[in-house]
């Protein structure tokens, strides 16, 4: 009636709520490989890219482990007798559906991740509840499926969501992702990846020493590998700033969906996008702050994901109703 909710600009972020679980009561469980939401699409694009470069398609991996999430396994799957070479995760015996979350530099707790979406006016649109050990970029698809038909034009997220898969997902659906700047994770004293220029015509990278890094292969993670000539690099004056490899070969990777990331960078540099991203602190961050300060959202007294979902739904519904009541009071409307 009053068109209070504007679904064209959606802000997405996640916060963590401490679970009702003792940090000392845990067991190790063998980590199981969880299928990514874009795995099949990526595999097809990888094989198509390899065939375009004259290479054979990759064979499927033999995986005996069934995909598993943060805490849906039975207690029979937990054991203290884990082989040393197996990758394990810590699982609470009190609340198995929670996840082991790194809260600070030296602090870990069992927690739940609450991924939330709101509009530019601070109205909470939807949410999902996940184990605290799952990364935001992996859980995004579950929330996005709930937001698919609301008329979203811009999706404003933080650096944790800045991945080629999410960029492709949004752009293919006609939604503009608004990502922040993410600094390069390069060692001090070494050239950044941006200093290696991609030559699209020759499908090669050009290093600061003005030499080519030619295509080598496309790996299972979806990255094309471009390698330099070790004999040329051995005599290069920039070798100490380029690579520490014993054979003096520099490897630069480029994702098969890197074009989507470049489109997102163009969007980031568009006029008005920086101001739009700055509204996160007034919208989604404000919601989390209010929930933690006024509604006991720092921790939960309930066990299990289902009860946690109930708590979050009730809290967010109350926050929306309180916001609506204040709006009506300001407008002088009767509460009917």
What is each PLM-predicted segment?
Residues 1-336:
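Anion-binding and metal-coordination hotspots
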């Amino acid at each position: 009636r009053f068109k209070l909710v504007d679904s064209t600009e959606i802000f997405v972020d996640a916060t963590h709520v401490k679970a009702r679980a003792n940090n000392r009561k845990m067991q190790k469980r063998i980590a199981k490989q969880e299928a990514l939401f874009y795995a099949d699409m990526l595999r097809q694009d990888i094989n198509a890219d390899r065939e375009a470069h004259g290479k054979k398609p990759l064979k499927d991996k033999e995986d005996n482990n069934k995909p598993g999430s943060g805490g849906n396994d039975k207690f029979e799957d937990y054991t203290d007798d884990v082989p040393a070479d197996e990758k394990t995760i810590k699982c609470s015996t009190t609340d198995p559906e929670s996840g082991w979350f790194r809260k600070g530099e030296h602090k870990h707790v069992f927690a739940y991740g609450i991924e939330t979406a709101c509009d530019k006016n601070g109205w909470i649109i939807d949410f999902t509840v996940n184990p605290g050990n799952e990364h935001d970029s992996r859980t995004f698809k579950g929330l996005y499926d709930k937001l698919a038909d609301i008329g979203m034009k811009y999706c404003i997220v933080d650096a944790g969501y800045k991945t080629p898969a999410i960029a492709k997902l949004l752009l293919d659906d006609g939604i503009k992702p608004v990502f922040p700047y993410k600094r390069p994770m390069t060692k001090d004293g070494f050239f950044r990846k941006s200093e290696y220029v991609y030559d699209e015509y020759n499908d090669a990278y050009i290093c600061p020493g003005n030499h080519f890094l030619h295509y080598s292969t496309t790996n299972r993670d979806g990255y094309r590998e471009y390698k330099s000539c070790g004999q040329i690099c051995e005599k290069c004056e920039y070798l100490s700033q380029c690579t520490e490899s014993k054979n003096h070969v520099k490897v630069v990777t480029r994702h098969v969906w890197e074009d989507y990331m470049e489109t997102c960078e163009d969007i980031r540099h568009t006029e008005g996008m920086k101001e739009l991203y700055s509204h996160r602190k007034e919208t989604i961050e404000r919601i989390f702050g209010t929930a933690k300060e006024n509604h006991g959202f720092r921790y939960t007294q309930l066990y299990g994901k289902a009860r946690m979902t109930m708590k979050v739904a009730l809290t967010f519904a109350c926050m929306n109703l309180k916001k609506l009541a204040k709006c009506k009071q300001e407008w002088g409307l009767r509460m009917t």
